[in-house]
Amino acid sequence: MTKYVFVTGGVVSSLGKGIAAASLAAILESRGLKVTLLKLDPYINVDPGTMSPFQHGEVFVTEDGAETDLDLGHYERFISTKMRKANNFTTGQIYESVIRKERRGDYLGKTVQVIPHITNEIQAFIERGAASATCGEPDVAIVEVGGTVGDIESLPFLEAARQMSLRMGRNSACFVHLTLVPWVATAGELKTKPTQHSVQKLREIGISPHVLLCRADRRIPDDERAKISMFSNVPEDAVISVWDADSIYKIPQMLHDQGLDAIICEELKLTPHAADLSMWSDLVEKLEHPKHEVTIGMVGKYVDLTESYKSLIEALRHASMHTSTKVNIEYIDSEEVETQGVESLKHLDAVLVPGGFGRRGTEGKIAAIRYAREAKVPYLGICLGMQLAVIEFARDVVGLKDANSTEFDQETPNRVVALITEWYDREGRVEKRTEESDLGGTMRLGSQRCPIKPGTMAEEIYGKDVNERHRHRYEVNNRFVPQLEAGGLIISARTPSEDLPEMMELPRSMHPWFVGVQFHPEFTSTPRDGHPLFKSFVEAALAHHEAQAPVAVGEKA
């Protein structure tokens, strides 16, 4: 039978519940347990697909095409279990399901209320999510409850967790509460009162936490832990200090050293073998002792909010581990490139243009792509970054000066990137789309396997085929491909059924490393293995860096 660990948060948001939950899962998995994770989001949106990156950060896409919270990306990076649609749900989905049942008459004329109908539905979603785990029936399902204790939006989820714990009985569920212990500089001390009040609020709901994870910018002294223990009624050994670390991959060892996994296993009456965190130690060792160093410029419009590119940043870190290369990421505002030119790019070892939506900043990205192509600087374009690379090539090499995407210019006669007219909705149904259609749940989403053209750089990187995740509405227009190929561009991978371009590259006779991909490879990168595309990209950046390095006196050029 699956046992449950509920992870809640208090005082403020963004303390790192997702990292804490994923780190605990990694430790339990290293002890031989089958583990899955779920994220419950209290907002009323059906999913984060139409939410602004400034509001929500990255939208992580699962293998089966769900647009989910970025924490699911952390889950997949920390454990081997793949996430699915059922691993993330929102208040919007819960109410949508309950209202659909009410309209069908499933409640037999009863008054539909938050308790029991909404809370029962939440419990059903949790159990369904755990049962759908790709690892088979999990020994432990870790459930992260979004939001902060005290928020009105979170109350139904916390009540459902309380009811579920009561229904399942002792040793079947436990609660981990993550809270803030701030350092007040004027007083010169850590303050435990916010944590005390947060636990008090949780206990008012009927939940007594078994473990407290106390976030601070430094290690919490034992006397402060004892004070927190006394006021929160949590054993002192279960008051665990979680201080700021320079890498999230140090957190599993930090939590294990303080006995978190032992406390959880004791509470749930689990008897797995000892933890083996050598893989995490090896990864941290690689991260901290690189042999080389490169600087990669990420040209985008959300550069002030790096949460928007969370998986991409982590994918570059994974590549750095597996190539012994420190990767410095410089975030470059594409609108500044539009107004100030490409001078800010000239010291870079490689250029990356990530995915995105909307017209703002696109001409700056195109200018950066033109610079990378002409200066022979390694270039990787992802999703929109590939589409803009095709537009730049069409304009500046093929000679279609007004080439554009219909996303940015409906009137352009040279629609080298355009909206395709048939989509799959959230339930997998084929649906015709137009420019006026709703935005939510109407993109090409999820994993798709496609063959790779033999003899290409893509084949060197991936092998015979590629299986990656998508999130986009627009495609490279096949009508212009013959002209692009005549100019030298190579379409190195296509979808097997729709024959849509998935990868493009320039031959080495034109450029040493210039690749665009319509999919999002960052979603499948893990610290365990890295990702072949990002490893190849970092290696190309290193080769460029070494080629540009000045030759020392006495050395042969």
Curated annotation (Swiss-Prot):
Catalysis performed (reactions): UTP + L-glutamine + ATP + H2O = CTP + L-glutamate + ADP + phosphate + 2 H(+); L-glutamine + H2O = L-glutamate + NH4(+); UTP + NH4(+) + ATP = CTP + ADP + phosphate + 2 H(+)
Binding sites annotated in the UniProt record for Mg(2+): D71, E144
Sequence positions that bind ATP: S14, L15, G16, K17, G18, I19, D71
Binding site for UTP: S13, K191, T192, K193, P194, T195, Q196, K227
Enzyme Commission numbers on file: 6.3.4.2
Keyword Cell membrane carried by entry: no
Gene3D superfamilies: 3.40.50.880, P-loop containing nucleotide triphosphate hydrolases
Active site, per annotation: C383, H520, E522
Means of activity regulation: Allosterically activated by GTP, when glutamine is the substrate; GTP has no effect on the reaction when ammonia is the substrate. The allosteric effector GTP functions by stabilizing the protein conformation that binds the tetrahedral intermediate(s) formed during glutamine hydrolysis. Inhibited by the product CTP, via allosteric rather than competitive inhibition.
Pathway(s) this gene product operates in, as recorded in its UniProt entry: Pyrimidine metabolism; CTP biosynthesis via de novo pathway; CTP from UDP: step 2/2
Disulfide bond residue pairs: none
InterPro entries hit by this protein: Class_I_gatase-like, CTP_synthase, CTP_synthase_N, GATASE, GATase1_CTP_Synthase, P-loop_NTPase
GO cellular component, one term: cytosol
Stretch list, region Amidoligase domain: 1-270
Oligomer and partners: Homotetramer.
HAMAP family, A to Z: PyrG
Role of this protein: Catalyzes the ATP-dependent amination of UTP to CTP with either L-glutamine or ammonia as the source of nitrogen. Regulates intracellular CTP levels through interactions with the four ribonucleotide triphosphates.
PANTHER family reported in the protein's UniProt record: CTP SYNTHASE, CTP SYNTHASE-RELATED
Family assignment from sequence similarity: Belongs to the CTP synthase family.
Comment field (misc): CTPSs have evolved a hybrid strategy for distinguishing between UTP and CTP. The overlapping regions of the product feedback inhibitory and substrate sites recognize a common feature in both compounds, the triphosphate moiety. To differentiate isosteric substrate and product pyrimidine rings, an additional pocket far from the expected kinase/ligase catalytic site, specifically recognizes the cytosine and ribose portions of the product inhibitor.
Protein name per its UniProtKB record: CTP synthase
